[in-house]
Amino acid sequence: MLEIIKRLEYYAKVQPQSIALQIDDEIVNYENLYQKICDCTLNSPKFKLGCRVALLNDSPIVNITNYFVVLMMDGVPCFLDNKWSRDTIDKLIEHFHIEYVMTAIGKFKRTTSFGTYEKYISEQLKVDDLLHIGFTSGTTGLPKAYYRNEPSWIASYVENEKLIYNYEKALAAPGPLAHSLSLYTCIYALYSGRTFIGQRQFDAKRFISILNEQHSNIALFLVPTMLHQLLNVDTTITHIKSIFCSGAKLSESLFKTVSQQFKNANIIEFFGTSEASFITYNFNQTSPTNSVGQVFPNVSIKLEAQDNRKIGLLKVQSNMIYSGYVDVGVVQPHSWIETGDYAYIQNNQLYLVSRKSDRLIIGGKNIYPNVIEQQVKSLDGIEEAVVVGEPHRRFGEIAVLIYVGNQELDYTTLRRYLRQTLSRYEIPSKLVRVKDLPFTNSGKVARNTVQTLYLEGAFKV
């Protein structure tokens, strides 16, 4: 039996009336949650060990209850995002051999993949203590499915706990449970006997109101885009003690604003991926400006194919990594995995320079967009910046800066500023100011979408 199931049973006995889940105005205590899970398990049809079951309901409480029902029955829950198109959901069910779907509490419905058990079970059984199958939030193509086992998340909880200093009894994440960060937070809360606070759909004003009603200290887990929306709500909440932010680095100006509005909170920025889990942390921006933070003590770093500036492809090893992509092969604990980032490291601080797929080659030289973007975002009045490539006959491609800000950048002034730290090949050839930029579900700028829009002429130069 998984440790999380044992813990739910324990908390149902020793703190039965403690709130386990609060989603908007809906509240469930530990006793009722565990009893509902047990009742549904007893009344559900039996299936084979490791059978894959999709969770697809509008209610997070229904989904998380079904999550544990599937685990109690030795199945594998697969969290699907109900905001995906019907076509995407059908393709995922078929491609990854998901045999059942649960659209209501305790109710199983066979899918078109029913009977495909033998096609996937041999690989899946190589994963010890499998918790669920998650899906990446890619901007193009079908989301990738990956295995997440329980020991890797328990290891993450251990490291997370070291960064919580104020006895936070509630963990809040307003994002969908289909997203790794919110599901992680929910299971973390239940594993540690805390209250999980979430929402059906993110509403900054309503979320702040719910947090205001709490009587215990709170730790928030969210992405920068959501944090930015919370700042637009007038509030003086004093019992938010920790803000864990993942997905993209906070600009200095945004960090300052967050610090002023949530005066009693420590702000911890994580860098990591769905596959690698946590890699680095930046506590109250005490790390160097362009760094994504200090490497976690249980994470090892390796940089491959380094250039003369010691920039290389980032690989990580830890007890927090995933167990591999579905249908690609199982990754054993403590294996080295590639993140797809170019990076360098100094004094145990990690510096990202580009995604592998984002690197530009201008005049035969490797140019890393993130380096340019960080310099631009350090300017007053610049909210967001992304550098994309445009084909060029002479140089192969040139860099184009697309930015959001309350001021128009003067090219000559910007060039003079950037030349202090960047080479001439890294200076963007064109500047484009836009009102806003598209983001992924994980809170990152949708770079591929931005490049496509630019090349199609959607942005005016």
Curated annotation (Swiss-Prot):
Q: Which GO terms describe its molecular function?
A: medium-chain fatty acid-CoA ligase activity
Which Pfam families does this chain map to?
AMP-binding (PF00501), AMP-binding_C (PF13193)
Q: Source organism's superkingdom?
A: Bacteria
Q: Which UniProt keywords apply?
A: Fatty acid metabolism, Ligase, Lipid metabolism
Class in the EC hierarchy, top level: ligase
| An individual GO BP term | fatty acid metabolic process
Enzyme Commission designation = 6.2.1.-
The record, for SUPFAM superfamilies, names:
Acetyl-CoA synthetase-like (SSF56801)
Q: Which family does it belong to?
A: Belongs to the ATP-dependent AMP-binding enzyme family.
Protein known as: Putative long chain fatty acid-CoA ligase VraA
What is the originating organism of this protein? Staphylococcus haemolyticus (strain JCSC1435)
Taxonomic lineage of the native organism: Bacteria, Bacillati, Bacillota, Bacilli, Bacillales
